[in-house]
Amino acid sequence: MKQKTLKGSFTLCGKGLHTGLSLTVTFNPAPENHGYKIQRIDIDGMPVIDAVAENVVDTQRGTVLGKGDIRISTVEHALSALYALGIDNCLLQVNGPEFPILDGSAVKYVEKIQEVGIEEQNAPKDFYVIRKKIEVKDEESGSCITILPDEEMSLTTMCSFESKFINSQFATLDDISQYAAEIAPARTFVFVRDIEPLLQANLIKGGDLDNAIVMYERQTTQERLDMLADMLHVEHRDATELGYIQHKPLVWENECTRHKLLDVIGDMALIGKPIKGRIIATRPGHTINNRFAREMRKEIRKHEIQAPFYDPNEPPVMDVNRIRELLPHRYPMQLVDKIIEIGPTSIVGVKNITANEPFFQGHFPQEPVMPGVLQIEAMAQTGGILVLNSVEEPERWSTYFMKIDGVKFRQKVVPGDTLLFKVELLAPLRHGISSMKGYVFVGDKVVSEATFTAQIVKNK
């Protein structure tokens, strides 16, 4: 799968939730490996902030990115839409300290993205595949986010509002392609008990019933409720009647929890990579979301080079017989048993190392270790299959080494190991010459790596 960006630019205008300012945000296409960057075009020098978890400086009433004295808030809805629709690279330009709140959901962003279209780029999409359970908890609030291994990204949010009229809810998104219809229209919400402190803090100047669901879930005095109704410019209501205060009906009964899921995706966008895993978020909020995103970035840095996923129960893309049709190598020099994944620019091969390998007779009889040069040879054979797979009549061509660079051996390979070869093209095949980067894994660990240049030559 390839990285994606927008086919063109688009602009949205509206007021800021907290500042009440009239704001404009423009979404622009960006080059490969650019990621999400946000630019304050109203400030001298037009500073740019990378949209990553470490740059979050506040999570009290939304996600606020910062760099020095520069701040950009309420970014989560825009990033949620980009991330869910598979956009990897985008430059967002805003003319103020926050994004416009629009209708309190992500639906306007989704509509505009779909309107301008999505463009596939050449670079491969760099997924991070979850291999083990990762969990972040806040004992005080009871918030918890857990991510488990899964083949695709899916999310479940569970919220407990501890109210007589709204208690526990959950929302699930098993298929990210359903985001536009099932999650994007869910609006932000606020409790009546929180409105007065927010107003006293000089916030929510742009908040109204057109961009938020207001929940009156705990009874207060009639006098206080009337005062808040006047602030919101809505009709007075009986203080004994709990419920929603809104202009528009709920889109779904669990709209508030769906919006929490929308926010989780927006804060996940700050991880910087698309994720394959199942997220379960209990009582999520921007603070725990950001802690989770930071933890994920630490985990990714620890496994900068990630081993391919291998399920021995799945049938291979190419078995040993098909490999023999492509490669001239035979016993004892055929060093790839099967291919489990192949695409235009990458390939994954497998070799099972047994005690019967002929090279163990001399390397070394008392302590059998696979020679490093044979690991490189096996990597190159895998890369050769990748290159040959891109030409017509591959059986009529052979691959030859031209150069090997950056060879590193990190760990011994011994009988019983299963080797995974991951090889990626560094540049397209030109004039029969290709550059590739290869890794050999045992389990999750890299045991060797190399960069090599090879040439395909037609057989005589």
Where are these regions (language model features)?
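Active-site helix/loop of acyl-thioester processing domains in fatty-acid/polyketide metabolism
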Residues: 258-271, 339, 369-394
